[in-house]
Amino acid sequence: MANQKIRIRLKAYDYALIDRFAQEIVETAKRTGAVVKGPIPLPTKIERFNILRSPHMNKTSREQLEIRTHLRLMDIVDWTDKTTDALMKLDLPAGVDVEIKVQ
């Protein structure tokens, strides 16, 4: 489509899974003749939590946990209807959140 692009944003806790799925999207889009910009790694969001180890006492003894959310961004320009059909047929792995916007 003229002057439109598809922006895909991927979110996952496992960086290997998100990279593998991003590569699959790039290969599928290029196979249909579209131009792909990315995947661009965005800053990793790190959430840290402190919880008490003991249920009753020992406030100084704590467990530190963190969750890392990895993000990837890619733009598909010069796409066709074949590109959208091929992207819709991709199997989405469990653990990857996908946001798709047509701009």
UniProtKB/Swiss-Prot annotation:
Gene3D superfamilies from the xrefs?
Ribosomal protein S10 domain (3.30.70.600)
Please name the Pfam families in this protein's record.
Answer: Ribosomal_S10
Annotated InterPro entries: Ribosomal_uS10, Ribosomal_uS10_CS, Ribosomal_uS10_dom, Ribosomal_uS10_dom_sf
Q: Tell me which UniProt keywords the record has, alphabetically.
A: Ribonucleoprotein, Ribosomal protein
Question: Does this UniProt record's set of keywords contain Ribosomal protein?
Answer: yes
Superkingdom is Bacteria
Q: Which GO terms describe its biological process?
A: translation
Keyword Ribonucleoprotein in the entry? The reply is yes
Where is it found, in Gene Ontology cellular component terms?
Answer: ribonucleoprotein complex; ribosome
Q: How does it assemble?
A: Part of the 30S ribosomal subunit.
The family line of this record is:
Belongs to the universal ribosomal protein uS10 family.
Q: Which PANTHER family match?
A: 30S RIBOSOMAL PROTEIN S10 FAMILY MEMBER (PTHR11700)
Q: What does this protein do?
A: Involved in the binding of tRNA to the ribosomes.
Descriptive protein name: Small ribosomal subunit protein uS10
Q: What organism is recorded for this protein?
A: Neisseria gonorrhoeae (strain NCCP11945)
What broad taxonomic lineage does this protein's source fall under? Bacteria, Pseudomonadati, Pseudomonadota, Betaproteobacteria, Neisseriales
